[in-house]
């Protein structure tokens, strides 16, 4: 009975997602500037427009991360660091000292122009592009992939660029 209550209380609402990463990734090609096209809402980027993420590869496969955006015309930025894991396409990212979060590149086009990123949680999803606007066919393909993976794409916030 206790087990059943635990499942009802904690397990039934868990969204099943496929957050598997790309099979290979060249971090030198992934590095650089990315526009955040869409994202799930989360506290640390709430109401931000013109969002970008810049990744700079350092020694020992460490990556410096700079996230920028604007809120009510005011420039906001957050610097962090990332480190690679044994799983291709998966990073550990920190913006707050020793506390790391999961970051997964789940879809990446062959030319490293567009990406679908997430984490181990169904609460994080983002669409990145090297350009501020996605081609409609590319957008629909990424949305279809996210939906196939179990994400509710109706929750995406489309970022003003």
Language-model features and meaning:
Residues 1-9:
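Bacterial N-terminal signal peptides
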